[in-house]
Amino acid sequence: MMSSRILRNVGLLGLSVLLLAGCSSLRVFFPSKTYETIAPEVPAALSKPAVLLFSKTNGFRHDEAIPAANALLTELAQERGWSVFATENGAIFNPVDLARFDVVVWNNTSGDTLNAAQKKDWQTWLSAGGGAIAIHGAGGDPSYDWDWHPESFIRAQFTMHTMGPQFQDGTAVVENADHPATRDLPERWTHHEEWYSFAESPRDKDVDVLVRVDESTYAPTFSLFWMDTDIAMGDHPVVWSHCEGGGRVFFSALGHQAAAYQTPEMVALLGGALDWAADPSLADCEDKGAE
C-alpha cells in the first residue's frame, strides 16, 4: 500500500498536470487499459545484436521525447552494425519474438502496458539473461498496477518532479566512471531536466549508482499556485544499473525533453548503456541468475 506521502504527492502532481496541460493529460489519472493480442510482424532477418525499442503509453505520453530517443538509439545501434525494431504493440512480449532480441528498451513508456501473459513472458526473458534499458518516463508513474515494475525492474518509486520551474539546470555527478555508460562522460556536467524525485534512494537496493544529481545546484521543489512541496531526497541518484535475476537493467531518469537526446552527454550515456545491456560479460548477472 502506498504511503500517505506518496498519495498526497500523486494528487498534487495530477492536479498540476490537469491545470497546465488540460484534458489531453487526463490519462495520468484515467489511464487506458489497451492490450494488444496480435504481435507485430518482425523482419525475418535481424542482425545480432538486435534491439527492440518499445514506447507504448497507456498513461502520460512524452510526445517529443519518444521520437527523439528512438532516433538516437536507432542511430547508435546502426553505427554498431546492430539491427533495430520499434513498436508500441505489447503483444511482441511473447517467448518467440523476445528470443530474437538481445536488448529491449522501454522508451518513456507509461501506464500498464502489458497483459498478464505478456508480463510473465517479459520477466522470464529478462531474468534468463536479457538486457534492458528504461528511460525517464518508464520509471515516472506515481502508481503502478504491477508492483514488480517499480520494485524489481526500476527499483525506485517515482513521487514527483520539479515544478516552478519544471525544467532546471542541475549538476549531474558521475559516481562510477568505470561503467560503459559513464566512461566517456565528464566527472560533472550541467544538464537541463525535469528532475524526478523518488520515495527513497535505490542505493540500498543492490544497484550500481552511476550518476547522481547535486541538489544544491537546482531547486528540488514542487511549487504551483498555493502548493509548495519540498521534494529533495538528499541522496539523489538519477542513473543506475542492476541485475534482475540473470538479466541486466539500466535506468536513466534523464530525458524528458527532445533536446536532451542531442547533447553529447546523453549520446555517450545511451551508447554505453546499449553496449552494457547487450554484452553479458560486462556485468556479473549470470551468477545471480543461478542463485
Regions found by a protein language model. Name each.
Residues 49:
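Nucleotide donor/acceptor-binding cores
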Residues 21-22:
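C-terminal motif of bacterial Sec signal peptides marking the signal peptidase cleavage site
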Residues 2-11:
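Bacterial N-terminal signal peptides that target proteins for export
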Residues 5, 53, 59-142:
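Helical hinge/lid and interdomain linker segments adjacent to catalytic or ligand-binding clefts
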Residues 112-187:
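A glycine-rich, often tryptophan-bearing local segment used as a flexible ligand/cofactor-contacting loop or short
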Residues 58-59, 92, 111, 139-140, ...:
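Short, solvent-exposed loop/turn segments at secondary-structure junctions
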